[in-house]
Amino acid sequence: MRISLVTPPSQNVEPYIKVFESKGVKVDHNSIHPDADFIMMTTQAWLHLVDNFHNTFPDIPIVSLTLDFYKSIWNSPNPHGYNWNLYKHYLNKAEELWCISNEVITRMEEEGIDKDKCHLMKIWARFFEYEGEIKDDRYILKTIRPYKYDKNYGWLERACSELNIPLKQPNHGASEQEYHKLLAECSFMCSEYHETSTGGLGILEGYKLGKVSVVSDSPYHGAIDYLGDRAIYFDDKNNEKIKQIIKETWNNTPQPDLEDCINFCNNHPTIDDNVDFMIERMNIIKKRGQIE
């Protein structure tokens, strides 16, 4: 099998290439070969390549690893110049959509995209073994990057300011070593947005170290798929509720059983599981095409 993988730089997507090739799948990264079996798109970024490849080789089927699909982004200013209608066009054209949470599936269905083409594939997390001391240094950690157009943007910062609680936000600017230390030494984490496909995988990586997360109970928050009832939820409809939950969690910070946290995270899909799933789905599509 041979695929054209179209993706901008991504610490969770680019590592797939090596795993695909270890399993006998040739990957052309942001390029295409006439013998490709599939064009795999991943996001609205670099859609011009998908468009170019499809126009050059219109008979090569498209599949989509759909990482996110946010209404708040569609309706916001568009500084990157994304072509949303073209993105939706190719999602509709794709043979299958592999979605990393039910939030993604729900939003796409609301935009008229065929839900029957969607398959849930929870994305792998970058778990690590921490050699230092896991402790509570009394600060809240927000691992997810700023979503400035989300309706809940600023809720956490305002709550922490009013409660005089330290908040750390690396905004993807910390080194890997610094990031691991931030996770290992926080009191707990928070992912307050209304709309996010996973809640930020840091909430899962931190949970393996025994750190809990406060998250929105929005139906468009993907943490429910990744942490389930192991997260602490606040009422997404009321910005005062996050302040109340933050205060309660700060004053009585949960300390879950570390072994149980580790076992839970060890059952999360690995990068190999993700690649095996995608290969299996592509083989099914190929067989389906032969029958038709």
Regions found by a protein language model. Name each.
Residues 212-216:
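Short hydrophobic beta-strand element within catalytic cores of glycosyltransferases
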Residues 126, 131-151, 157-160:
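Conserved donor-binding/catalytic core segment of Leloir-type glycosyltransferases
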Residues 130, 237, 251-291:
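A charged, aromatic-enriched C-terminal amphipathic alpha-helix characteristic of glycosyltransferases
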Residues 38-40, 54-76, 98:
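Active-site proximal beta-strand in glycosyltransferases
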Residues 228-239, 247-254:
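Conserved acidic donor-binding segment of nucleotide-sugar-dependent glycosyltransferases
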Residues 181-198, 211:
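Acidic donor-binding loop of glycosyltransferase active sites
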Residues 70, 103, 120-131, 264:
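Short beta-strand->alpha-helix junction loop in the catalytic core
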